[in-house]
UniProtKB/Swiss-Prot annotation:
Taxonomic source organism: Micrococcus luteus
Full protein name: Protein translocase subunit SecY
Gene it is expressed from: secY
InterPro entries assigned: SecY, SecY/SEC61-alpha, SecY_CS, SecY_dom_sf
Function description: The central subunit of the protein translocation channel SecYEG. Consists of two halves formed by TMs 1-5 and 6-10. These two domains form a lateral gate at the front which open onto the bilayer between TMs 2 and 7, and are clamped together by SecE at the back. The channel is closed by both a pore ring composed of hydrophobic SecY resides and a short helix (helix 2A) on the extracellular side of the membrane which forms a plug. The plug probably moves laterally to allow the channel to open. The ring and the pore may move independently.
Chief location: membrane
Length: 436
């Protein structure tokens, strides 16, 4: 560890990239505490003190914004609009042939898809900012009767929408700059920072409300979950590939053997985001349709509140688990293209020895991916995502469970990816030094 740090210090270029990354992350965190224009900050503090901002609508989004959502700051939307836009653009490759064509055009096509993602991020940010401003106008955003805006005029609402949308675009710009000029994937690092920022407050809340015994249990569960996630994320199925010998001029090429590494969790955390987004819709309906004057809500609102108002009901848990499994299978099926992989192998004289009994190469690849995804990957994601929900029901902690499976899954994945990129850059500079 100390040797690695010493090598980084002796590499000025890499050190500048790390300093640039940490600087933008620090600015991002400071922006989480800057109130948006037109927001009545004392009213926000009173509503937060009342403790009504709990539940599925808040916990997941607030986790990705590093607490900025409940502060109604300029970065309240966080990185979620960009994540949603990226997922939508990726899924549109299956529906729109033009998007698939752009994806295959490599650098030029990727630049066009990135531009589409930015436009969609702007549209989603405007939509979410308008929703937040409407809820803040009545106080329903934080579950209290106090309006969170200085006044309910259209101008004030418009200023809040502009401030929140601009904040989202600034966060997107931070992420792109980190990816281009810093270390690691910028968007992933911002998510990592937002999740990590909520850990101290979450753990402190567990100690205050549940005691040190429950705190020790939570830490133990978090450590075991982290070890399990590292093991699964680094696991892979290696499909052997053999290349036949070919005669090109006077040279004989090929004849080598390699493998296709297939990760156990190919979908990463995207199915969890899908499932959480779907199950946040009932919470949004509850917030919009719950009377603020204390009168009884409609029967269907009562029914939604009973089953989907929090994450500790068995119906919510079962539906959440099934959605994750379904989305995992769906996402892997549209992102992993066995036909394309098979064509690329045939173009260079490659084949899979084990595919002969199972038929064509693409059918064998589809068979292997289906087994890995459904038997291991989907169940693994479902179990990991269920950890905080089970904790809500068993130990009675709040919705802001600090060491939930989703948060640890994201942090471990981003951490491993960043460490690998730093190591790769260090090795690259080491070999460049030898060549000189």
């Amino acid at each position: 560890m100390l040797k690695a740090i010493a090598r980084i210090v002796r590499t000025p270029d890499l050190l500048r990239k790390i300093a640039f990354t940490l600087g933008l992350i620090a600015v991002y965190r400071m922006g989480d505490f800057v109130p948006a224009t037109g927001v009545d900050y004392p009213a926000v503090q009173q509503c937060l003190a009342a403790g009504n901002a709990q539940g599925g609508l808040y916990s997941f989004v607030n986790m990705f914004s590093g607490g900025a959502l409940l502060q109604v700051s300029v970065f309240a939307l966080g990185i979620m609009p960009y994540i949603t836009a990226s997922i939508i653009v990726q899924l549109l490759r299956v529906v729109i042939p033009r998007f698939e064509q752009l994806h295959q055009e490599r650098r030029r096509g990727q630049a066009t898809l990135t531009q589409y993602t930015r436009y969609l991020t702007l549209a989603l940010a405007l939509l979410q900012a308008t929703t937040m401003a409407s809820l803040a106008r009545t106080g329903a955003l934080l579950g209290c009767s106090l309006p969170l805006l200085r006044d309910g005029s259209i101008l004030t609402v418009l200023l809040v929408v502009i401030a929140l949308t601009t904040g989202c675009l600034i966060v997107m710009w931070f992420g792109e700059r980190i990816t281009e000029n810093g270390v690691g994937n910028g968007m992933s690092l911002l998510i990592f920072t937002s999740i990590a920022a909520g850990f101290p407050a979450g753990l402190g809340q567990v100690v205050q409300t549940q005691g040190w015994r429950v705190f020790a249990i939570v830490m133990g569960i978090g450590l075991l979950t982290m070890l399990a996630i590292v093991f699964v994320e680094e696991s892979q199925r290696r499909i052997p590939v053999q290349y036949a010998k070919r005669q090109i001029g006077s040279r004989t090429v090929g004849g080598s053997s390699t493998y296709i590494p297939v990760k156990v969790n190919m979908a990463n955390v995207i199915p969890v985001i899908f499932a959480s987004s779907v199950l946040m819709l009932p919470g949004i309906l509850i917030q919009f349709n719950t009377p603020q004057d204390g009168s009884a809500p409609a029967p269907w609102i009562t029914w939604l509140s009973r089953y989907f108002g929090s994450g500790d009901h068995p119906v919510y848990m079962a539906l959440y688990f099934l959605l994750i499994i379904g989305f995992t299978y769906f996402y892997v099926s549209i992102t992993f293209n066995p036909v394309e992989i098979s064509d690329n192998m045939k173009r260079y004289g490659g084949f899979i020895p084990a595919s002969a009994p199972a038929g064509p190469t693409e059918r064998y690849l589809q068979y292997v991916i289906s087994r890995i995804t459904f038997v291991v990957g989907a169940l693994y994601l479902g179990i990991v995502a269920m950890i905080p929900l089970i904790a809500f029901a068993v130990i009675g902690t709040s919705q802001n469970f600090p060491l939930g499976g989703t948060s640890i899954l994201i942090m471990v994945g981003v951490g491993l990816q960043t460490v690998k990129q730093v190591s790769a850059q260090m090795e690259q500079r080491h070999y460049e030094g030898l060549l000189r």
